Amino acid sequence: MAFKYALVADSLVWVGYNIFENTDEVLRAVKEAGYDGIDLPGSPSTMDGAEWKKRVADSGLVSPEVLGAWGYGHAGEVRNLASKEDDVRNYAVQYAKDCVDLAADAGASMVEVCAAQPAVPELPFPKDPIGLLRDRFRMSLKEICAHAKEKGINIVMEPLNSYEGFPGVLTTIYEAKMYIDDLGLDNLGIQPDVFHMNLEEGSIPDALRAVAPHIWHFHLNETNHYSHGMGHADYKAIFRILKGIHYDGFLANYCPLTTQEILAGATGDVYGTAGEERSGGDRSQRPDLVEALSTMVQFQKNIEKAVDLSRERYEADERRY
């Protein structure tokens, strides 16, 4: 079965665009480039879910997920699901519940959560005991999943690397599985991300095999954040594993980092910049959107074809002997 491909809307700023500006034009470009879906930003205070559901459907796409904005640099505020402070944790839980409501209204089936570092990262270990942070994060998951269950929404955990997420709380695929095993919730799954796995997992293929039934969404994000193929991600190995475990969810592509000037030219409220003036932007340097998006997804589809062909030949050889 062929993979389904989505675009992570938040990452459009890396190539100088913004989903909140000329939304319909951007959605049409995503469809024209060859994608099946688009992951929506986790901005429940500014988005009308019903309106976005119609816009996405009119463009011929679907929205698999609402991607939460958790890191301080992305959110512009503290959203800490593992905090020992009740008011801080409750605030983050409420944000997640609001994202669930947005997903339900927008026709998405999943919401992403993670255990992001605070504004000042705590390295190499958190200030508070890891066991305490895990307990608090576990409490948050229970509350969020209960609300999501009422709305028919699944929650997917995205393990972050230790520079962006609390070390020892949710930085590996295995830690994500620990929460699934502990809580036993049928609407809690995992969203692996190639960039983060590259930093944290001893073996990406082994990690994916270990949690195969729990992978419900997947982020394709090159190991250096640049164009797919310019890092050292072994996409063939990853795709072979996903084909082998019969993964039937979406592969969500991140746009690549380009230049500081192009990022600065992405207008609007992105990455915690609400109300801020950004200088140095040059929108004339932006790549053509359809071309940029189609280059990414075609790269992935070509690898998928190669993997499918090798699997077919291997199966044919097995039958021959």
Language-model features and meaning:
Residues 1-15, 69-82, 115-125:
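N-terminal small/glycine-rich loop or linker at the start of catalytic domains
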Residues 11-13, 42-44, 69-72, 115-119, ...:
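Active-site-proximal loop/turn and secondary-structure-junction residues that shape catalytic pockets
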Residues 2, 25-32, 46-71, 101-107, ...:
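Acidic (Asp/Glu)-rich catalytic clusters
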Residues 14, 40, 80, 125, ...:
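Conserved short-loop catalytic and cofactor-binding motifs
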Residues 58, 82-189, 283, 287-290, ...:
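Active-site acidic/histidine proton-transfer and metal-coordination neighborhood
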Residues 1-16, 20-31, 170-192, 196-321:
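Histidine-acidic metal/acid-base catalytic patches
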Residues 39, 65, 112, 156, ...:
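Conserved beta-strand positions in the central sheet of alpha/beta enzyme cores
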Residues 48, 121, 165, 228, ...:
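Glycine/Thr-rich phosphate-binding loops of Rossmann-like dinucleotide-binding domains
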